[in-house]
């Protein structure tokens, strides 16, 4: 019998979350962002749910090829563009759109030796300062591309750094969208500005012909704890489940786990769960991180080890060897433990937890 830890992927929840995007931005085309192997869910596992999107956005060519191999004939956008001149040949072969964010990438397109009709997304660095042309250099970059016979379409693109909250005491999007609009207002072309946080928080304020929905598709709130997934109508798409494999009874002053950093203050019962940091659960998750045991919310106790962790069974009379444990997601009876609750307790974000689940965990698709 295999080790009992599984990651259940809920197709219905994926479809629900895509529908939330559509409802929020009914006049926009929707890119489903599936970078990092669909945020740890697996591109092949989410494809059926997301093929109702208008396109897929991802990072590298191998992921793009996997999408094409599944039968997708619609748009695919490389969010970081090409990494070498040779990649442009694959863009032609697989009909890929790509971001342009640097002088080098423009030069590669200018020097491409064969006829092509590239669909590019020109990125402005409107304030995040990772990729893109600063506003004062953006028009020059656009003009260079617009003069090329092998560039068929240019979409204006930017990425918000603070759409999930405030920036220096102002609404998080204000600084960047002002800089962006001032430059592109007189240039032809469609726009792609909204990420998950902007889709949900500023749907009535932003014009975005293409939206790039990422974390919201996977059942994590982009502005937690201000809003939960329930507030946005989102559903958890990944449930990391395991079982209790041992029950231990602690007396006062007895400890559990490496470092003895949890010591019982009174008699208590704990369960040992088949899940550890080698499965992708965070080693730094402290005592008190929420879990579900038999659909009842409780907490972890002690240090997470490679293959196991301990949970407090106080008040859970049904708990025994074989009891279901939900590390995040939803239980088999439908009780939800939001991944954001676990992430905050662990000092991280839901994105990291999803992406960290390792290959030794069995994935199960649930319709």
From Swiss-Prot:
<dbReference type="InterPro" id="IPR000821">
    <property type="entry name" value="Ala_racemase"/>
</dbReference>
<comment type="function">
    <text>Catalyzes the interconversion of L-alanine and D-alanine. May also act on other amino acids.</text>
</comment>
<feature type="binding site">
    <location>
        <position position="306"/>
    </location>
    <ligand>
        <name>substrate</name>
    </ligand>
</feature>
<dbReference type="GO" id="GO:0005829">
    <property type="term" value="C:cytosol"/>
</dbReference>
<protein>
    <recommendedName>
        <fullName>Alanine racemase</fullName>
        <ecNumber>5.1.1.1</ecNumber>
    </recommendedName>
</protein>
<comment type="pathway">
    <text>Amino-acid biosynthesis; D-alanine biosynthesis; D-alanine from L-alanine: step 1/1.</text>
</comment>
<dbReference type="Pfam" id="PF01168">
    <property type="entry name" value="Ala_racemase_N"/>
</dbReference>
<feature type="binding site">
    <location>
        <position position="130"/>
    </location>
    <ligand>
        <name>substrate</name>
    </ligand>
</feature>
<dbReference type="GO" id="GO:0008784">
    <property type="term" value="F:alanine racemase activity"/>
</dbReference>
<feature type="modified residue" description="N6-(pyridoxal phosphate)lysine">
    <location>
        <position position="35"/>
    </location>
</feature>
<dbReference type="GO" id="GO:0030170">
    <property type="term" value="F:pyridoxal phosphate binding"/>
</dbReference>
<keyword id="KW-0663">Pyridoxal phosphate</keyword>
<dbReference type="InterPro" id="IPR029066">
    <property type="entry name" value="PLP-binding_barrel"/>
</dbReference>
<dbReference type="InterPro" id="IPR001608">
    <property type="entry name" value="Ala_racemase_N"/>
</dbReference>
<dbReference type="InterPro" id="IPR011079">
    <property type="entry name" value="Ala_racemase_C"/>
</dbReference>
<feature type="active site" description="Proton acceptor; specific for D-alanine">
    <location>
        <position position="35"/>
    </location>
</feature>
<dbReference type="GO" id="GO:0030632">
    <property type="term" value="P:D-alanine biosynthetic process"/>
</dbReference>
<dbReference type="Pfam" id="PF00842">
    <property type="entry name" value="Ala_racemase_C"/>
</dbReference>
<dbReference type="InterPro" id="IPR020622">
    <property type="entry name" value="Ala_racemase_pyridoxalP-BS"/>
</dbReference>
<feature type="active site" description="Proton acceptor; specific for L-alanine">
    <location>
        <position position="258"/>
    </location>
</feature>
<keyword id="KW-0413">Isomerase</keyword>
<comment type="similarity">
    <text>Belongs to the alanine racemase family.</text>
</comment>
<dbReference type="InterPro" id="IPR009006">
    <property type="entry name" value="Ala_racemase/Decarboxylase_C"/>
</dbReference>
């Amino acid at each position: 019998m295999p080790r009992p830890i599984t990651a259940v992927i809920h197709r219905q929840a994926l479809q629900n979350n895509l529908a939330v995007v559509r409802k929020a931005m009914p006049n926009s085309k929707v890119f489903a962002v599936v970078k990092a192997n669909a945020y740890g869910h697996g591109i092949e596992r989410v494809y059926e749910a997301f093929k109702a999107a208008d396109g897929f956005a991802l990072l590298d060519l191998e992921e793009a090829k996997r999408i094409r191999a599944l039968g997708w004939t619609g748009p695919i956008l490389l969010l970081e563009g090409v990494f070498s001149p040779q990649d442009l040949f694959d863009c032609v072969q697989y009909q890929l759109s790509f971001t342009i964010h640097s002088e080098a990438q423009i030069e590669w397109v200018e020097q491409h030796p064969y006829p092509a009709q590239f669909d590019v997304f020109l990125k402005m660095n409107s304030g995040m300062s990772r990729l893109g042309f600063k506003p004062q250099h953006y028009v020059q970059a656009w003009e260079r591309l617009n003069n090329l016979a092998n560039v068929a379409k240019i979409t204006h693109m930017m990425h918000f750094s603070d759409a999930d909250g405030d920036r220096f005491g102002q609404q998080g999007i204000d600084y960047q969208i002002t800089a962006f609009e001032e430059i592109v207002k007189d240039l032809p072309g469609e726009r792609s500005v909204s990420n998950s946080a902007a889709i949900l928080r500023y749907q009535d304020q932003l014009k975005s012909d293409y939206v790039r929905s990422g974390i919201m598709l996977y059942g994590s709130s982009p502005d937690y704890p201000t809003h939960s997934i329930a507030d946005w109508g989102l559903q958890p798409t990944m449930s990391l489940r395991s079982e209790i494999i041992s029950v231990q009874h602690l007396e006062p002053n007895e400890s559990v786990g490496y470092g003895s950093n949890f010591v019982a203050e009174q008699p208590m019962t704990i369960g040992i769960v088949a899940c550890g940091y080698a499965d992708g659960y965070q080693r730094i998750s402290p005592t008190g991180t929420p879990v579900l045991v038999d659909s009842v919310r409780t907490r972890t106790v002690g240090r997470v080890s490679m293959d196991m962790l301990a949970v407090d069974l106080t008040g859970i009379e049904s708990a025994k060897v074989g009891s279901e444990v939900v590390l995040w997601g939803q239980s088999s009876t439908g009780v939800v433990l939001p991944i954001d609750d676990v992430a905050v307790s662990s000092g991280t974000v839901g994105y990291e937890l999803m992406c960290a689940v390792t290959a030794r965990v069995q994935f199960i698709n649930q319709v």
